[in-house]
Amino acid sequence: MSIRFESIEKLTELIKNKEIKPSDVVKDIYAAIEETDPTIKSFLALDKENAIKKAEELDELQAKDQMDGKLFGIPMGIKDNIITKDVETTCASKMLEGFVPIYESTVMNKLHDENAVLIGKLNMDEFAMGGSTETSYFKKTLNPFDHTAVPGGSSGGSAAAVAAGLVPFSLGSDTGGSIRQPASYCGVVGMKPTYGRVSRFGLVAFASSLDQIGPITRNVKDNALVLEAISGVDANDSTSAPVDDVDFTSDIGKDIKGLKIALPKEYLGEGVSEEVKTSVKEAVETLKSLGAEVDEVSLPNTKYGIPSYYVIASSEASVNLARFDGIRYGYHSKEAQSLEELYKMSRSEGFGEEVKRRIFLGTFALSSGYYDAYYKKSQKVRTLIKNDFDKVFESYDVVVGPTAPTTAFNIGEEIDDPLTMYANDLLTTPVNLAGLPGISVPCGQSNGRPIGLQLIGKPFDEKTLYRVAYQFETQYNLHDAYENL
């Protein structure tokens, strides 16, 4: 097997045993990118010169047996809405084309401390608004399992690059499913941590009460290793939680006998395709065979997740994106004749159609005549959804269901139909609204397109999710499939 498909754990072992140099790993990764990414189109920018320089510095430390850091010499790809100092960060938007940050995000500082190596920035839906990576201003990323299909979104580049063996891990952001849904479509492992588990400092905000950064990998243990590296309280983010337990790997191999798992009947209901239902039911039987107890439950407010999510997220986006005015930074219209024209033209020319749609929706929902009818009511629904989960978690350890209602759809199939596109978030948005952790792991395929199983946990109980996911992975995984892509 090529180095490009090795796990973080295996690469770390090879580096620690001096069987391979960090610079060899990085050069192998760039060779893979040159071979594969012209087709997949997962990267927006590469930082090759700095990456090789950093890897060669790590070679010297390796020779001196000074291999500090959990991710020493491990290559990484970062979603392009996460600030990277001195590396262009565009959010896949014309609005930020050419923007080079002068500071580092907290997650990047943490990863640098662990001696990971930045390979480049990954494609996404513009400002993380979309479910297919088709709203990117620069390019459309393809699904490595089927080049006629989307990779999902908004972290489509992050999932596609990992599946194609172009990086062992990537970071994405998840506002309503943007890590888990592309992980499902691309047959990889994607974790949306509990809200507050990972610092958002340096994440370009979409919806501040929903956004969360998380890792995407090809196996469960690698995912847990990366989350350990990026978790922790941060003085720069007032919403980051002071939770001490960031050990997700020590108990990961523990069995799940006696664990109580809830399967909501709504998660296998209307809108979920038959092939997804079949795969998830088979996955549930696998969990039972591993000793877990699985019962059917109800989360009655699930159907209100999408409408309440899109009102809340769009409202927050309309405020967060007000900073892009054509004056301080970002796209600046050359044709404007007045200050008012500058605002209007810079924003209308700099933002894509989906971003403008959500700004309009959010501004409408926050307007004085409609605030109570839409925004306030949506926040009440959010509370009801959280209460549903709280009630289930009084008796159960984990909630299980599909990650997405269908497998990946074809490129161009839904981009002009926003309501159909939004419906793909049916099973992921409630997790963000409730602030809970959720992980997607591969559980099947239909016509060559992967299907993801979603596991949802109690607040700050990512450890249990990793245990269940790890045990399930011993029975079903796509490890042998990646190299054949």
Curated annotation (Swiss-Prot):
The protein's name: Glutamyl-tRNA(Gln) amidotransferase subunit A
UniProt keyword list: ATP-binding, Ligase, Nucleotide-binding, Protein biosynthesis
Organism, scientific name: Staphylococcus epidermidis (strain ATCC 35984 / DSM 28319 / BCRC 17069 / CCUG 31568 / BM 3577 / RP62A)
Superkingdom of origin organism: Bacteria
EC number(s) from the headed UniProt entry: 6.3.5.7
Active-site residues per Swiss-Prot or TrEMBL entry: K79 (charge relay system), S154 (charge relay system), S178 (acyl-ester intermediate)
Any one annotated GO CC term: glutamyl-tRNA(Gln) amidotransferase complex
HAMAP family listed in its UniProt record: GatA
Function in brief: Allows the formation of correctly charged Gln-tRNA(Gln) through the transamidation of misacylated Glu-tRNA(Gln) in organisms which lack glutaminyl-tRNA synthetase. The reaction takes place in the presence of glutamine and ATP through an activated gamma-phospho-Glu-tRNA(Gln).
Subunit structure: Heterotrimer of A, B and C subunits.
NCBIfam families: gatA (TIGR00132)
Gene Ontology terms, MF aspect: ATP binding; glutaminyl-tRNA synthase (glutamine-hydrolyzing) activity
Pfam families on file: Amidase
Reaction(s) catalysed by this chain's protein: L-glutamyl-tRNA(Gln) + L-glutamine + ATP + H2O = L-glutaminyl-tRNA(Gln) + L-glutamate + ADP + phosphate + H(+)
Stated family: Belongs to the amidase family. GatA subfamily.
SUPFAM superfamilies, alphabetized: Amidase signature (AS) enzymes
GO BP terms: translation
